[in-house]
């Protein structure tokens, strides 16, 4: 049994990222689970080794420890390919503009792929494949879903039902890449992760991931989607809000003060270290409301 934190190494972690990481660590450690670290670096254009090292150093500085070696998704491509071959899939030749225009149809739910390429005849596929090849582009690979919704359980929100469409498993374009939904399901199963603590901006992904896990024969983990940190304007905190990364905050405050701010955002005052917070952490008292930075 294990929890995990899985950042994408595209820059320094900000206060909201650090808070979610702390919560993932607290939930796992307080329940006697292993805590694993995974670097989600499948977006090779945005990811960097330097960002990964910086993120891991920040988490360690805050007192978060993990079990075993860090797993890098960039080493797992063979596993994703093996999983893909087990699934019912089809090629998608749509551009982003194609999907946006098709999604404006009144019968299509926002954010749901309308299935444009699902029923194409083979001769149509050959033609569209050739058109993309002439542009040095590859088709995407989509799951041929057999349901339009799927049930899952969230520890903070109870029973949930979310939309499922023919979502992308392998991104197309000039540089194809593995999609988040496939990679995260395969890696959670591989690592034995049975508890996923993450921001509630990813709640909409849970139904797709739980459904995909069912197709691959892996049980869904316990989902715990925690409230985000928002800025003063009620928008999700971002690095552009200024002085929100650990390095920036350390300019004006010592590390124990920054940790105290993180603990305070969870409702614990006067706590200056991860071990101290772990001793008193009570998941039942976690606020369901976002924290305003």
From Swiss-Prot:
Keyword Cytoplasm: no
Binding residue positions for ATP: 239
Cofactor: Zn(2+)
Extent of motif 'HIGH' region: 7-17
Cofactor note: Binds 1 zinc ion per subunit.
Gene Ontology BP terms: glutamyl-tRNA aminoacylation; tRNA modification
Gene3D superfamilies: HUPs
Keyword check for Mitochondrion: no
Keyword terms: Aminoacyl-tRNA synthetase, ATP-binding, Ligase, Metal-binding, Nucleotide-binding, Zinc
Entry superkingdom: Bacteria
Record EC number: 6.1.1.-
GO cellular component: cytosol
Listed InterPro entries: Glu-Q_tRNA(Asp)_Synthase (IPR022380), Glu/Gln-tRNA-synth (IPR000924), Glu/Gln-tRNA-synth_Ib_cat-dom (IPR020058), GluQ/Sye (IPR049940), Rossmann-like_a/b/a_fold (IPR014729)
Motif, 'KMSKS' region: chain positions: 236-240
Recorded family membership: Belongs to the class-I aminoacyl-tRNA synthetase family. GluQ subfamily.
Protein name from the UniProt record: Glutamyl-Q tRNA(Asp) synthetase
UniProt source species: Corynebacterium glutamicum (strain ATCC 13032 / DSM 20300 / JCM 1318 / BCRC 11384 / CCUG 27702 / LMG 3730 / NBRC 12168 / NCIMB 10025 / NRRL B-2784 / 534)
């Amino acid at each position: 049994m294990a929890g995990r934190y899985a950042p994408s190494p595209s820059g320094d972690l900000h206060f909201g990222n650090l808070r979610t990481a702390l919560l993932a660590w607290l939930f796992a450690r307080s329940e006697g689970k292993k805590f694993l670290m995974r670097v989600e670096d499948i977006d090779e254009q945005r990811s960097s080794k330097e960002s990964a090292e910086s993120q891991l150093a920040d988490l360690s500085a805050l007192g978060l420890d993990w079990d075993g070696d860090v797993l890098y998704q960039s080493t797992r491509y063979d596993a994703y390919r093996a999983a893909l071959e087990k699934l019912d899939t089809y090629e998608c030749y749509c551009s982003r503009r194609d999907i946006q225009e098709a999604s404006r149809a009144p019968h299509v739910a926002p954010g749901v792929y309308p299935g444009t390429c699902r029923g194409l005849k083979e001769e149509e596929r050959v033609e569209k494949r050739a058109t993309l090849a002439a542009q040095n582009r590859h088709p995407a690979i989509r799951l041929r879903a057999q349901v339009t919704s799927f049930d899952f359980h969230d520890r903070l929100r109870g029973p949930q039902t979310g939309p499922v469409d023919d979502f992308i498993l392998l991104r197309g374009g000039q540089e194809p890449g593995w999609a988040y939904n496939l990679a995260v399901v395969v890696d959670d199963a591989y690592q034995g992760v049975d508890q996923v603590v993450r921001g509630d901006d990813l709640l909409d992904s849970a139904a797709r991931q739980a459904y995909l896990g069912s197709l691959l024969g892996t049980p869904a983990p316990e989902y715990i989607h925690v409230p985000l940190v928002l800025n003063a304007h009620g928008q999700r905190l971002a690095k552009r809000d200024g002085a929100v990364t650990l390095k920036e905050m350390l300019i004006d405050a010592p590390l124990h003060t920054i940790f105290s701010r993180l603990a305070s955002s969870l409702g614990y005052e006067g706590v200056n270290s991860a071990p101290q917070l772990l001793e008193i952490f009570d998941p039942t008292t976690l606020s369901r409301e976002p924290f305003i930075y």
